[in-house]
Structures are given as C-alpha cells and as structure tokens.
Amino acid sequence: MTEFTHINQQGHAKMVDVSDKQITKRTAVAHSSITVNETIFKQISNNTNTKGNVLNTAQIAGIMAAKNTSTIIPMCHPLPLTGIDVHFSWDETNAPLYTLNIQTTVSTTGKTGVEMEALTAASATALTIYDMTKAVDKGMIIGETYLESKSGGKSGDFQRQSGQ
C-alpha cells in the first residue's frame, strides 16, 4: 500500500522534502472540457463575445494558474516552470451542444513533478471560459478534469488508458 507522503508522524500536514531527489525533465499533460450552447459556440468561434477574445483570455488564465499552483494548492512546491501550453479543440458531434476540449502541457527540469500545475491550468482555463460567457448561459457544464500523461521522476511515466 502506498503511504501518504503529505502527512507527518503526528498525522498533520507537511510539505514533502524533495532535497535528495534527482533533477530530471518532467512533463505533465492534463485535460478538461466545457460544454456550451450554440450561441456561446458561435461567440467563441467568431470572437464576438462582448468581454473580449475568450480563448486568448482563457489561455492566459491557464498559464497564470500553472505558474501560481503552489499558492493555491497547499502542499505543492513552487517550481521554475520551463514551458506551459494550452490547446483547444471543438467537438461538434452533439450539436446544438458543443464541447470545447482543453489540453494543457506543463514542463520543468526539477526535483518534483508538474501534474498539479497541468491540472490547475486545465481547470482555470475552463473556469475562465465559463466566467467570460456566463452572461449568455449559466447552464454550461465543465467536464471531467484528469491527468492524461506524465513523464520523468522517480515514479516513472504514466499514460492514461482509454476508459481509465
């Protein structure tokens, strides 16, 4: 059984000491999504939302969120991130509902992984899209948020299998 590393001998929270870990290249890819109605889909696609360019703003929010993960997730280490990317792709198969898939990739060269940074980026990206379009429809659905893959570090690589 795996032990919880963020709990000390007294049962209280602690931040894990990574001093003795090896410096390696670490990358994590996370996914989230938001399902919107046709009006919002058209506003985003045609860049006609009155608050501005929704995707550009959400992309910047995702990048900022990754950079600030350690300030909102208590046991995360502050990391010198070396790369953050946010990609979007529309799924139009269930029109008149449209799902915007969000994929975030975060990398560093360091002593601990960037899974939480990638997940935080994906979440903040979806939340920003909701915030910028909620005046049109508050019924949007933010979908599952999950880690797609990670590489580097002591625990090795991870690749989510379909259906996992």
Swiss-Prot record:
Assigned EC number: 4.6.1.17
Keyword Lyase among record annotations: yes
Pathway it works in: Cofactor biosynthesis; molybdopterin biosynthesis
GO-annotated biological processes: Mo-molybdopterin cofactor biosynthetic process
Reactions this protein catalyses: (8S)-3',8-cyclo-7,8-dihydroguanosine 5'-triphosphate = cyclic pyranopterin phosphate + diphosphate
Keyword Lyase among record annotations: yes
Active-site positions on this chain: D131
Keywords: Lyase, Molybdenum cofactor biosynthesis
Summary of the function given for this chain in its UniProt record: Catalyzes the conversion of (8S)-3',8-cyclo-7,8-dihydroguanosine 5'-triphosphate to cyclic pyranopterin monophosphate (cPMP).
Family: Belongs to the MoaC family.
Protein name: Cyclic pyranopterin monophosphate synthase
